[in-house]
Structure formats: structure tokens, C-alpha cells
Amino acid sequence: MNNITISESIKYIGVDDTTLDLFESQYIVPNGVSYNSYLILDEKIAVMDTVDARKTKEWFDNLDKELKERVPDYLIVSHLEPDHSANIQLFTEKYKEAKLVLSAKAKAMLPQFFNIEGLDERCIVVKEGKELDLGNHHLKFIMAPMVHWPEVMVEYETTEKILFSADGFGKFGALSHDEDWACEARRYYFNIVGKYGAPVQTLLKKASTLDIKMICPLHGPILKDNLGYYIDKYQIWSSYQSEDEGVLVASASIHGNTKEVALKVVDLLKEKGVKVAFTDLTRDDMAEAVEDAFRYSKMILAGATYDGGVFTPMEDFLHRLQHKGYQNKTVGLIENGSWAPLANKVMKDMLTPMKNITICENTVTIKSTYKDENQEAINQLVEEICH
């Protein structure tokens, strides 16, 4: 167990997973992930969520170590996604008198995951603002539907002023790996929670009324210092503002010719002092490309024509942006095609339904390979995207 100190009465009992290759079977996690769980020791004892089934033994070992032969009274179920709920059934079988504290939606969904004997008698359903008295500690329940599942709730511990934020403020990366918070928190947010900006805004508004001294998420580090920094990031991300002025250049090239043009654009932008990120959609992490698309204020797409459409990595990228609510951006288009270039039309058609997307009037069409005659169109696109 990570040697993490929260307070004398509140213990960390979570587990690192450093061998997981794909989170949610799609997001690469080179530095692993943490499944966070907490224990409040008072006159009554509350366990805050469980962990993924991959780490059942370690979690129960951590729990038993901190309980010191005491028995939990409550299991708080903030979120039913299996990486946090997998051990609910085992918990109820081991601690037969313990109650499950959860939202009405979570109780309705629970039988879809588990067959818990005497479920009605085991559950305490809580509503907005309800408080659970543990003795010196009190948990206030705040409903957070669609952050990012419908049953989610967060908890505010009123004595030590701790927000248990469920998946909010989470990040990729095991706690044993020390790294900057923002990068992997941003990638986590836009790929996991990003579609649900409005519910996140609602939760942030509720949280703004609380005196929060610490944030304990279900993934990633416990946040104690400079909480305004993390909250400001979430305000920006959930309101679909651009975090940085700059341009993401995203290339989907079959034989390298489209990528060559995209890299020329990158060089021109850098010469103008523009902050630039480049992604090769055929090879780079797609989740990181999504992250950067939301991070920067502008984007240039360079896509090859393929089967009468656009090369599939670009199509996949744009579908992901559609699903995640991409909006409030300026986008430039570059296409390549040897006999019937159609990529710009397809990319434009995919972008048009997105909210508040401005597509540059100047576009670039390459016929197979870059020629000097293409430079003027490239220059015009770069000038437009810079203004």
C-alpha cells in the first residue's frame, strides 16, 4: 500500500495497478493507474468505495490492516463502474451487518452487477444534502449525475473539510509514479468525462459553496495544496474553453506525403511564434490527440483521401471529437488525393455538426506529393489560422 497520509482518522486503503496496459480496454496507461479507496475511523466506520477486481486481495489486506479487528458499519458507493465497485459483493459477504450507502439510481443498478442477499435491508438510499453521522465526522452527500455515470454522488466530510470527488479530479498514473498532474489529468478528463461538461459545471457550482481543504478522487493523487489551480482547470475544461492559445496539427498520412505537408505547416507556425503540437494519428496515442484538440484554441487537419472518404485514422479521430463534445474552435483543412481528392469535404461534413466550429476559408489540396506551387495555399492557410 502507498504510504499516504490523509489524517489521523481518515486512511488511504487504495491500490496501484502498474501492469494494466489499457484502461477501459482502450486508453494506454504507461504509468499504470490507481484505484483509490478510503477509510473513516470514528464511532462508526465508513469505507469509501472498493477497487477493481484485479486488486481484490491487496484491497482487503489494506482494509484489514487499518481496521485493526474493528468492523465497518458502512460502505459508501459513490460510483458503480467496476473499477470502483468490483468488491461490493465480497464486502457484503464478509461484513454481513454493514450497510451500503448509495444513491437511488445506484441501488436500482446494483442488481445488474451483483446478487446481494437481502439487498433492500442492506441499503441506505441518500438524497441531496443528506448527512451521515459517524461520530466526530459527518458525511454530506451531493448528487453528481452524469459525472460520468447517472448514479454518481460525491461526499463532503464536514469536520476535516474533505471532498471525496468520485471520478472528478482523477488522473491516469499509479501513485508510485511521480509526475505532473495536469497532463494525465487532462487526458483522463477529456477521454473519460469530457462529454459531460454541463453536469461537471453543475457539480462545480455545488462545490463552490463548500469550504474544501482536500480533494480525494477515485484515481490519482490526493489534492491538498493550491486547490484553486485544480478547480480552475476543471472550470476551463468543463466549459469547453481553450486552455492554451495554439494550434494542434493532426496528420493522417498513408505513405508519408500528407505528413510531409503537415510538418511544413508545423515549421511555418513555429516561425511565427505560435505554440504548436503535432500528432501523427496513424501512430500516436489517439487519446492524447483528443486531449490536445481540446487544449488548444485551433487545429489543422491534414488527411489523405481514402476509399472515397478520408483516411480512417482521421475519421476515427473526428468521430471521437464528435462524441466528446468538441466545440468553440477554429479548424483548417489540408487534403491529399491522387485522382479525386475528397478528404476536405468529408472532414468539413464531420466538423459542421459540432458546436461553434469555424472552418478556415483557405484550404489546401495536394495532388499526391508536395510541389512548390502548393506553397502559396499553405501560406494563406497559416496566415488565416494565425489571425
Q: How would you describe each model-predicted region?
A:
Residues 3-63, 154-157, 161-165, 258:
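Conserved beta-strand hairpin/beta-sheet module of binuclear metal-dependent hydrolase folds
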Residues 48-50, 72-80, 100-103, 163-167, ...:
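Active-site neighborhood of phospho(di)ester-bond hydrolases with catalytic His/Asp-centered motifs
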Residues 87, 285-289:
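Short acidic active-site motifs
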Residues 175-215, 219-222, 242, 264-279, ...:
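FMN-binding flavodoxin-like domain, especially the glycine-rich phosphate-binding loop
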Residues 219-244:
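Terminal amphipathic helices with adjacent charged low-complexity linkers/tails
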Residues 250-272:
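Short, charged N-terminal beta->alpha structural module
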